Amino acid sequence: MISDKNVNQVLKDDGVDNSLLEPGHKYENVSTINIKQIEEELEFKDSWAVRVIYNKRFGGVIIKQNPGEGNRLHYHPDADECWVVLEGEYEWQIEDEVSRVKQGDIIVVKANKWHKITAVGDKPA
């Protein structure tokens, strides 16, 4: 099992080829973000990820994945993680507990907790 120090590599290994995670792009650290605008401007067709916040205290990435896609079991050594499900459904595993989450759910994972996600259902999450 691995830590996720290199987020670009983690996402590529998990099948997310369309990503914008490098520091300094136009969507990062702005006060207002529109997800549909990002999708239209970047013309991402399948799974994608865009970092929208990154500083010493917090990081935020918008991710869209198709059913069956997800990530491998991993942990974050230096930070807690918070997810807001905007659409679709995920199967979440945190340590030994597995649950299904859907649109409107918020998930919090403490630092050093093993976790993984898989998009499930019949539409992207």
For the regions a language model picked out, list residue spans one by one.
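Short acidic-glycine-tyrosine-enriched beta hairpin
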Residues: 96-112
